[in-house]
């Protein structure tokens, strides 16, 4: 059990879920690079299921001047979300930012999912929505005390329903709505809530998503010609957090699609269908 460590007056403490790879790991590296050498430095709490991968990220961030705490966490389990926050407070006594990044993708036509396999829809909701809800609820008193920041990494699939992503879109729409409502609740408390909407990003989540059977799909099913580098994606999310922005919509197509949806929803539905590879489109 880590011992309590008082942060220096200028040190900020950030929690990142899903920090073992992809966007979460890159945000950790960029935060360490930006603040690690500053007076007071930065404390990073890195959470995910893989202890080994988390430690590798922590080693890199430590080399950049950050102080790191690794907490192995499955965000689909409420008690582990609470333990993540408890360990952070025991170690540092404060939380300045919570980045809800942990998530699982999925690519499956709803008609191809058997009734006996629908349980993975519920599990996806536990990871993508409830993990963020539980972590945020546990951290909220400390974030209020620090007048800190909450980041929710949603998806363009949380703004526009994407064919083949009924489960994933459901979780991300729910996440979008939850944090939109929470933002209004926390305005007077001085806690910012930034929701990020990445499109296709070059990370392993593309191939680690679930198929109709709830098994690893091995492919995103999406065209990836315009996929964003993970470094750019992480930088845009962190910029939104620094500026305490309400939302960060990543791509030009995403911004355009969101606007067009209000006036011509059928056009956006065709755009979403055209984003799929031909072999995964409904016949």
Q: Where in the sequence are the language-model features?
A:
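Residue(s) in the substrate-gating loop at a strand-loop-helix junction
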Residues: 155
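Conserved glycine-rich cofactor-binding loop
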Residues: 20-21
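Conserved mid-core segment of classical short-chain dehydrogenase/reductases
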Residues: 105-122, 164-167
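Conserved glycine-rich Rossmann-like NAD(P)H-binding loop of the short-chain dehydrogenase/reductase
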Residues: 34-57
